[in-house]
């Protein structure tokens, strides 16, 4: 097995663990979300996790041949992921402590365009490269992203109450 693949897979999972730990500490009220050092560490962890996929999947030890249409589908997923993730980030104009409920633009259709983008990014790289071994870290990452979404929805419902419940009923994911 390619040692680069193992190293990058471990870095991916480390980034995932750091972000998940942050979310748990945030839920418990045990982390200062305005602390720039904390933000930098979590942001770097997310970058490592997300940037590991274009390195990891081409080196996957259990790759299978992917038909052209599947490869292109994976690439379209990656491009859509970038549009959703960066579009959501630009629209939010921040990542933490946003004092109002954003319900326009991408957020008028998707409650979590950035999380949707992360999921498409991961799945797109796996599909594009037929990366069978990478399905394990992909499942862990996507499962955690869905968990982060749940934590975020609980926090938004606590903060915005009925306004958020109405918004949630009218949008997907």
Task: State the predicted function of each range.
Residues 103-116:
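Histidine-centered phosphotransfer motif of kinases
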């Amino acid at each position: 097995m390619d040692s680069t693949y193992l190293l990058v897979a471990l870095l991916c999972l480390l980034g995932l663990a750091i972000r998940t730990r942050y979310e748990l500490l945030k839920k418990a009220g045990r982390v200062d979300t305005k602390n720039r050092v904390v933000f930098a560490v979590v942001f770097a962890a997310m970058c490592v996790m997300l940037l590991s996929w274009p390195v990891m999947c081409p080196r996957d030890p259990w790759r299978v041949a992917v038909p052209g249409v599947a490869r292109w589908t994976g690439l379209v997923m990656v491009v859509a992921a970038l549009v959703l993730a960066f579009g959501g980030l630009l629209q939010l104009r921040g990542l933490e402590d946003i004092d109002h409920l954003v319900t326009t633009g991408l957020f008028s259709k998707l409650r979590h365009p950035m999380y949707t983008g992360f999921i498409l990014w991961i799945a797109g790289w796996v599909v594009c490269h037929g990366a069978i071994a990478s399905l394990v870290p992909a499942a862990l990452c996507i499962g955690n992203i869905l968990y982060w979404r749940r934590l975020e929805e609980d926090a938004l419902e606590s903060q915005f109450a009925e306004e958020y419940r109405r918004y949630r009923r009218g949008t997907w994911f």
